[in-house]
Amino acid sequence: MLIYQTDQDWKYSLGRIFQPFYWKLRGDLVAPMLIGTLSVLYFTIALVLIIRLFRLQNKLQIAFLCALLAVNITITSTFATDIHEGDTYMLALLCATLSVAAFRKAHLILGGVFICLCLGLYQAYLQVAVGLLLLLFMQDLLDGENFKKVFFFGLKSIAMLLGGSVAYTLIMRFILHVKNITLTNNYNGLADVGDYSTTSIPNLIVKTYQYIITEWLHPQTFRSGFVGLANAGIILLTILLFVLLLVTKVESNSSRVLLLILFLLFPFGINIVYFVSKGMEHTLMTFSFGLLYLLFVLLLHYFPLSKIQKYLPYAAYA
């Protein structure tokens, strides 16, 4: 019988090289109360960072966002099936959020360190960092930030993501060499990552978009039809708000083009793991899909009709 909590070699072979080190600090005992407490702590800090990153002030919108992220199907599935790793996954979420917070403070090296830690804990949460960065750049453009400045920020963020990924890869290779362990190419394995020799990249890009849209409209939840309908309403409102803001709020054509590109890249960015893994993705890996609600809240914040604005969260929830 495979016991995940103590089979450290298996974790190393999956590339989750920092999980065994974290367990040494936390202890190998699977105590639900301890794991639950740590998970809530990490998750709460991540939410607070997100709220501060995007300067959210409206209490209703904050409650709306936090509630939807807290009941994310990934969170529910994690603690229903993999509670022994729940705090590890939430720490990966926190590291992804901290990387973006560090980037916002112009600490690129520190941001890269957190990207490295995130990948070494659970690679799937990398797309949370990607999604938050895309949303930050969209917010900057809506706030009237200069096109060149935002574009330069984008290049710096790519450098941070690549730097953290390279550092993770080098550390992983070193640890695997020392422990004489090879990367697995089985379930959740990394051995084939980056090998697209037998894959149609255009087709994979289309499938990456299709997968996330399917998960939004047909989520794997209780009352899937109701939740899918609510998500469809939020998506339609988000597109409507985006088009209105693109036309009325952004003055520079170059900024409009960049904002549109970021908006179109957003679904791909928060599902980048699907593309990298060539379709190997499941519910425990899709927390980032909930960033749709953050995008909705951000656009709602800029909506000029303030009298209608306060009723939109109720309409979306209904």
Task: Locate each region found by the language model.
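Transmembrane-helix motifs of polytopic, lipid-linked glycan transferases
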Residues: 37-63, 98-101, 240-244
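Short hydrophobic/aromatic helix or loop-helix immediately within or flanking a transmembrane segment
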Residues: 9-33, 37, 41
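Membrane-interface micro-motifs in multi-pass membrane enzymes
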Residues: 12, 16, 39, 60-104, ...
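Hydrophobic, aromatic-rich transmembrane alpha-helices
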Residues: 48, 213, 218-257
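Signature aromatic-anchored transmembrane alpha helix within multi-pass, membrane-resident enzymes
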Residues: 108-109, 231-236, 301-318
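Membrane-interface transmembrane helices that cradle and orient dolichyl/undecaprenyl
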Residues: 96-110, 140-145
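Perimembrane helix-loop-helix junctions
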Residues: 129-162
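Membrane-interface alpha helices of multi-pass inner-membrane proteins
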Residues: 108-123, 128, 134
